[in-house]
Regions:
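Low-complexity repeat regions of mature extracellularly deployed or surface/particle-associated proteins
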Residues: 1-144
């Protein structure tokens, strides 16, 4: 999913296993985005990847974006941002989230079984990050 310009908003929902999600909201304005996933091995690409504080927040979103941050790359570039990620009772789901500039947020959740990974990089402006994880073997890395 690629969303350009002005008032932006997006909802991505995946039910099932072995899906791959990628989304970008670029070039500003009001942004938004909700990601709701139920199922296993989404964005997993047969593990292992990430690790150690979600691989140091996916190497600071691949060094502020020579791009490549993969494993369910979700990117908001500029303006008011926000993002909600919900993963429900699932295993082995991987997300790399980048908010580059403006008012930022990101909420999280990821509840249920385990081995889920999230890399969160918020580079520039007002930032925030709330996250809950439940289960075992989960990994979260945040860089601001």
């Amino acid at each position: 999913l690629w969303v350009d310009g002005k008032s932006n908003t997006a909802t991505l929902k995946a039910d099932g296993n072995d899906n791959r999600l990628r989304a970008q909201q670029r070039f500003g304005e009001n942004n938004g985005m909700t990601i709701d996933v139920t199922g296993n091995n989404n964005n997993d690409l047969s593990n292992p990847s990430f690790a150690g504080a979600a691989q140091a927040a996916r190497t600071d979103a691949n060094n502020a974006t020579g791009i490549l941050f993969r494993r369910g790359s979700v990117w908001q570039h500029g303006s008011e941002n926000e993002m909600t990620v919900i993963v429900d009772n699932s295993n082995n789901n991987d997300f790399a989230m980048l908010q580059q500039g403006s008012n930022n947020s990101i909420s999280g959740n990821i509840s249920g079984t385990g081995s889920n990974q999230a890399a969160v990089a918020q580079l520039g402006n007002n930032n925030s990050t709330n996250f809950n994880q439940s289960g075992s073997g989960n990994n979260l890395g945040v860089t601001q």
